[in-house]
Swiss-Prot record:
GN (gene name): addB
EC number: 3.1.-.-
Spans traversing the lipid bilayer: none
Pfam families linked to this entry: ADDB_N, PDDEXK_1
Xref: NCBIfam families: addB_Gpos
Job of this protein: The heterodimer acts as both an ATP-dependent DNA helicase and an ATP-dependent, dual-direction single-stranded exonuclease. Recognizes the chi site generating a DNA molecule suitable for the initiation of homologous recombination. The AddB subunit has 5' -> 3' nuclease activity but not helicase activity.
Cofactor(s) needed by this chain: Mg(2+); [4Fe-4S] cluster
GO terms, molecular function: 4 iron, 4 sulfur cluster binding; 5'-3' exonuclease activity; ATP binding; double-stranded DNA binding; helicase activity; metal ion binding
Name recorded for this polypeptide: ATP-dependent helicase/deoxyribonuclease subunit B
Top EC class of this enzyme: hydrolase
UniProt KW keywords: 4Fe-4S, ATP-binding, DNA damage, DNA repair, DNA-binding, Exonuclease, Helicase, Hydrolase, Iron, Iron-sulfur, Metal-binding, Nuclease, Nucleotide-binding
């Protein structure tokens, strides 16, 4: 019976000493009971190390234990195993219920207890109390002595939570912290380890409960040997001492044996001038000794074992590490298992390390836990509950369906069914009760019902079958979950829903089998383990809270709190692989080469200052009152220092320290103080970067197949551009050509050198087939011509290949335009039927008619989107206001005008009134233009008939001569030309152009510094909604458009003003009859030019750019064309800004005639 302390700095061989001692004992006294006690996270590594050193004899004669395993052995031998141990899940669920029940009685934690994450904090505090032997009696005594009122209230409430938790827990359970207390009790009467020889390794500190267990073992064991990382004993140099934690541990151990009257067998000092691990490596030995030495000494010898690398970003950093690892394996004959990569935050680096190491074919194992929240089973359960509790939303439904767990929707065919279903659901706004109803709508319009084709009827039948398959079990589950029930009842309903109704557990088993058959060990373990975790959490929930009455949402809160406590550990899939992990979890054991990545300021050492429920000040007060708890943030800073020291002394032969200049989001980062320290203690070390590397690796670029291929591409490109490249690339190229798997890819590389982002023209025959209708005619609208002028390739994709966006159930700008146009057309018909004149309409007339028309439109189309929600009901009311205001303005415009509305929605190409515009091309083909004019007004004046076109727009629009010239705004001129050419058929005599104008449908918001009279408001509204476009420069015609226009005034309804002399003021909106003729002639030639390019198959990727306005910004096909203005072949069709007079000159030069005016 006695304690022996084995001490030494890092790398002195403490662990090796223990294993050698055990080996010697086995050889000399094979029947002795030998125990090696290590922290839980190191048991696996230690077992491997002992097995490697001692062989199979270790299995029979020695045990590697953690405190948890030790307790398990004692309970099995001496009783106590019957007490069920509550896991973290059950503990958290119980704390949740305790906090909920105490909620209204709490003051300090009343609000905090409802916050996400508080349960974890409360759980940690309870654990801390138990670890440090803080019980109810201790809390009572301490609270009475506390003078600080805030801390007193906090401790009172913590005591209530602590006591209530323990009261409910101990009805049949213990938690892991109780295990040590129970172990302490059982060891008193347990002879299991009597006479054993025990070595305790890898600990830097012990909790009071662990110290108590050690005390009991000391009384029964033959000997207890404890290793501590210490430079020298009995020499604590204050809290900044590097070894402060371990020296305090030594002090506590010495106090323990003194109090218990246990013999001290002395110290074994393993310290030497150069630690055992670094005997052959002076630089690493110098780092171990001087990293935290004050004052420090410098090592000025040659540097071979330390590299510092400054990376541009995380990707550059990990790529450097990957290349260097391959160099070590290739040139230094390292095994992958000899190499470790560590950092302070594995989660941050996991994705980039996985991607790059996989690309470089480096086998690796990431020592971390996986959060199970994203596993398909957990997503499935939460989505199923979300569906029924959140009114069958799209998001929850397709999360549920896309988990791959419903047998009807597994595999490729199942995925296609879900895609078809999703398209329909998005297109028709399926949610809520619509899932319960038969789907009957398949119309293309969101505003009107349409006749359904036979093909679409069959589709609907199939979709309804799918819907039934999905809805039936969910609906039954929904009915079963209604109202309040005990947690046990909810647990039973949920499990039966998953297992009996949907066979989810069977599906999981099939996935596990599939993963095993396909060597997907990680996935097989995940799917198998998550099922067991779910069942375990469900059972714990029933055991702990089974009789608690709650609703479904409360049940899911409890369940998810339990599930959140579980993480799955990944398993190593090979023996020879690089070990990657957090700095706190990886130990030295045989690590020849170590890469410490992410050594940035605030990251390593960590700058975390989370205090938890008890602040540093709280802990200080409690310590004064006799309660010693875990470290405060100040102490943690010094502990972090020791952690850094431990990490930097792991490598036996080679150490690489890297840091990126930018993080994953591109934010700049500074190097850690550790980097500066290394430069000071080893002044000869040179910091490397992408452009400066000290290790001359001639073949660095030849690594794994994919990265080498990438480097080969760069080399071939250089060679293609005339630059010299290394000779070995020829052999690399030949190797890829010889390999069947890579030959095709290398051909792609070669072709890529000749790549241009240009589209070859399609043949005229193909163009005809693509653009002709079923009558072998090419019929199109003006807007389509304008689309071609914007970008020929986008037109080809949209109208040639007929690519369509996924239909979404929403009210878009085109829908709004159609709706407004239709109501205005119906409004005109209505007043005609009632024999009303526009000029006679009152505000009340307008409002009543509009309200009636809109209500009928919505009422008569039950599937209309405007019937779908209160939001759209609001929109409907808003549309009524806008339309009422618009017709009132039109009425006022007509009162002030001698023009009369001749016709609304005048179609050409769709009726006998106006024929399609036929465009005969020079190549012999013909195009036919169809369209619909919103409104045509007519004026008979001095024996002449004048026509003006009004185009209704829901947005602001003005006539832009520059856009017209470039084919981007031709519509009104095309309509005008069609009208004039067909005027004898329409108005029974030859007509002349009067105007082409846009009318904005709106209810404008007026801005004014003061109150306005009703008349002023009316004038401002007329001004805001003034007609915009081109007018015939004829004072009589203009005056007929606004008969209120007087000399010296500006019109409120058209873009014109009159000088005091009575003639018209200068205005670019006014053009002469000859200019109208020029525009008509030019628009025809422009259309012929566009159509000729179209039929010749020109599909250039040539988007228009006008100032900062780029067509690509609003194009749905930019991801197809991959237009890139930085490529030599990709250029915008720039629309230069020109003065109107220059454009008129250009038009005149192109189509002839004379310009009589500006």
């Amino acid at each position: 019976m006695g304690l022996k302390i084995i001490y030494g700095r890092a790398g002195t061989g403490k662990s090796t000493f223990c294993i050698n001692q055990i080996k010697k004992k086995i050889n000399n006294s094979p029947n002795n009971k030998l125990i090696l006690l290590v922290p839980e996270q190191f048991t696996f590594q230690t077992e491997n190390k002992v097995l490697s050193a001692i062989g199979e004899r270790y299995v029979l004669n020695a045990e590697v234990l953690s405190f948890k395993r030790l307790a398990h052995n004692v309970f099995n031998e001496c009783g106590g195993a019957t007490r069920t141990i509550m896991g973290d899940a059950g503990k958290s669920m119980l704390i949740f219920k305790v906090l909920e029940d105490l909620g209204d009685n709490m003051t300090v934690f009343k609000n905090a207890s409802r916050q996400k994450g508080f349960i974890d904090i409360a759980s940690k505090t309870i654990t801390e109390f138990k670890k440090y032997n803080v019980n109810n009696e201790v809390l009572d005594l301490t609270i009475n002595e506390i003078e600080d009122e805030n801390l007193k209230m906090k401790m009172e409430e913590l005591k209530d939570v602590f006591n209530e938790f323990n009261s409910r827990l101990h009805e049949g359970y213990v938690d892991e912290e109780d295990q040590l207390l129970l172990l302490n009790e059982k060891l008193d009467g347990c002879s299991l380890y009597d006479g054993a020889e025990i070595w305790i390794d890898e600990f830097s500190s012990f909790t009071p409960n662990q110290l108590s267990v050690i005390g009991k073992l000391l009384k029964r064991a033959k000997s207890v040997n404890i290793t501590l990382s210490i430079d020298e004993v009995n020499s604590l140099k204050g809290e900044s001492d590097l070894f402060v934690a371990t020296k305090n541990t030594e002090k506590r151990l010495m106090n323990l044996i003194q109090e218990e009257g246990i013999a001290f067998s002395g110290y074994i000092n393993l310290n030497e001038d150069i630690p055992y691990r670094f005997k052959e490596n002076k630089e690493l030995a110098h780092i171990e000794r001087q990293l935290y030495a004050y004052p420090f000494k410098q090592y000025r010898g040659k540097n071979n074992s330390l590299r510092l690398y400054r990376a541009n970003n995380n990707y550059d950093e990990i790529e450097f590490v990957a290349k260097d690892i391959l160099r070590l394996v290739r040139e230094k004959q390292y095994r992958f298992k000899d190499i470790s990569v560590i950092c302070r935050d594995v989660d941050n680096y996991e994705k980039v390390v996985s991607a790059i190491f996989s690309e470089y074919e480096i086998p690796y194992y990431i020592d971390k836990k996986i959060d199970i929240a994203s596993n398909p089973l957990i997503v499935f359960i939460n989505s199923a509950v979300d569906i029924i509790s959140k009114n069958w939303t799209y998001e929850s439904m397709f999360k549920y369906l896309k988990t791959g767990l419903i047998k009807e929707f597994r595999g490729i065919e199942g995925a296609e069914l879900i895609d078809e279903l999703e398209n329909y659901v998005l297109a028709y706004g399926i949610k809520g009760k619509k899932w319960m109803e038969e789907w009957v709508n398949y119309s293309s319009s969101i505003l009107k019902e349409e006749e359904i084709s036979e093909e679409n009827k069959q589709r609907l039948e199939r979709l309804n079958d799918i819907r039934e398959t999905i809805v039936t079990p969910l609906d039954e589950f929904n009915k079963q979950c209604k109202g309040k029930k005990t947690l046990k009842e909810f647990a039973t309903i949920l499990y039966e829903f998953l297992d009996s109704k949907l066979d989810i557990m069977d599906t999981l088993d099939k996935y596990v089998d599939y993963f095993k058959e396909n060597d997907m060990a990680i996935e097989a373990k995940e799917y198998s383990e998550v099922r067991d975790i779910f069942i375990d959490v469900l059972e714990q929930a029933v055991d702990v809270l089974g009789n608690e009455v709650m609703d479904l949402n409360e049940f899911m809160k409890v369940l998810n709190i339990g599930l959140s406590q579980y993480e799955m550990g990944l398993i190593p899939v090979a023996l020879d692989q690089v070990n990657i992990g957090d700095i706190t979890r990886i130990k030295s054991r045989g690590t020849k080469a170590l890469y410490i990545i992410g050594v940035n300021d605030g990251v390593l050492p960590s700058a975390s200052k989370e205090e938890g429920i008890l602040s540093d000040n709280d802990r200080e007060i409690l310590l004064e009152k006799g309660i010693s708890l875990a470290s405060d943030t100040r102490t943690k800073i010094f502990e972090e220092q020791f952690l850094v020291y431990t990490a930097f002394t792991i490598a036996e032969e080679y150490l690489v320290v890297t840091y990126p200049l930018a993080d994953f989001e591109g934010k700049s980062q500074r190097p850690s103080i550790i980097v500066h320290r290394l430069k000071k203690i080893l002044p000869n070390v040179k910091e490397e970067s992408e452009g400066f590397k000290l290790v001359d690796d001639k073949y660095e670029k030849i690594s794994a197949k994919i990265p080498t291929l990438n480097e080969l591409m760069i080399a071939i490109r250089k060679n293609y551009d005339g630059a010299e490249i290394e000779d070995y690339w020829k052999y690399v190229y030949d190797w890829y050509l010889r390999e069947p798997k890579w030959k095709e890819r290398i051909e792609y590389v070669r072709k890529g050198l000749e790549y241009t982002n240009l589209e070859n023209n399609i043949s005229k025959e193909k163009a005809k087939k693509l653009y002709e209708d079923n009558k072998n005619k090419i019929s199109l609208s003006v807007s389509r011509l304008e689309r071609y002028a914007q970008c020929p390739f986008a037109y080809y994709i949209q109208y040639g290949l007929k690519a369509k966006d996924r239909k979404i159930y929403e009210f878009t700008a085109p829908d709004l335009g159609s709706f407004m146009h239709e109501i205005l057309d119906e409004f005109t018909n209505e007043i005609k039927e009632k024999d009303l004149k526009w000029s006679d309409l009152s505000k009340e007339n307008c409002r009543n008619i509009i309200n009636s028309l809109v209500d009928n439109q919505v009422k008569n189309n039950k599937s209309s989107i405007l019937n779908s929600s209160k939001r759209y009901s609001y929109f409907t009311d808003r549309f009524k206001r806008i339309l009422t205001k618009s017709v009132m303005v039109i009425s006022e415009q007509m009162k002030r005008s001698d023009f009369e509305i001749y016709k609304n929605e005048l179609a050409f190409g769709f009726s006998k009134d106006v024929n399609s515009i036929k465009l005969d091309l020079p190549s012999g083909e013909s195009f036919y233009l169809n369209g619909r004019i919103d409104r045509v007004d007519k004026l008979n004046l001095d024996g002449e008939t004048y026509l003006r076109i009004i185009d209704y727009k829901t947005g602001s629009k003005k006539f832009d001569l520059n856009k017209f010239y470039n084919g981007l705004q031709m519509q009104l001129l095309v309509y005008l030309d069609a009208l004039i050419n067909n005027s004898e058929n329409i108005v029974e005599n030859q007509a002349m152009p009067g105007a082409i104008l846009y009318f904005r449908i709106d209810d404008p918001i007026l801005k004014s510094k003061g109150d306005l009279t009703e008349e002023e408001i009316k004038s401002e509204v007329l001004k805001e909604l003034k007609l915009e476009g081109l007018l015939l420069d004829d004072v009589k015609v203009v005056k007929a458009m606004d008969n209120t226009l007087e000399p010296g005034t500006h019109s409120l309804i058209i873009p014109a003003n009159m000088k005091k002399a009575g003639d018209l003021g200068k205005n670019k909106a006014l053009i002469t009859m000859e200019q109208f003729e020029l525009l008509r002639k030019y628009v025809n030639e422009k259309m012929v030019e566009i159509c000729q390019n179209m039929i010749e198959g020109k599909i250039d990727i040539e988007p228009c750019k006008e100032n900062k306005n780029i067509v690509c910004d609003y194009c749905n096909y930019s991801h197809i064309c991959q237009f890139d203005s930085s490529l030599e072949d990709n250029r915008y069709k720039v629309i230069p800004k020109k003065k109107d007079e220059d454009i008129w000159k250009s038009i005149n030069e192109k189509v002839g005639g004379e310009v009589n005016g500006d």
